Amino acid sequence: MVILPSPASVAAAAHWVKAWPEHITLATVGEGTAKVIRAAWGDDVKLIYPEGDAEDSGSEALWEILKHRGAPSRVLFLRGQTGREWLPEQLRSIGSDVITMCIYVRVPLELTPEQRSDILMAAHGPSPIIYITSTDAVDALFHAIRPVSEVRDWVTNGV
């Protein structure tokens, strides 16, 4: 089994893997990434994922599916240089041989002076609605807005 937890992991893997062998089953944590997998490798690839919206997805939802299917003997977990260890640990706890591999590197977002100006102007308007699905994305957002303290308050407090 190969687990691709994000669209970024799919994009990185697709750069190197043009087609998966028939005996490989792919898995991911949600429907959005499943669509990216289908776009990269077609509808015939074996794919396991929790169906539904964000409330029905995530590592925990995929774990429930995998538990009921039985432990995969070997798992290759392809991700960025950081990420939650929870799902690999759960798989190890039921006997899977899990290898976690970094296949892409996250680079911090640095706003240009123009982007800083734009976001500062936006901070004088209505508070944003931001939907973020990973702690790494939260870290990237706060890294990007750190030079503009008013924006951090605007994002965190709705002020």
Predicted region positions:
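Conserved beta-alpha
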Residues: 1-159
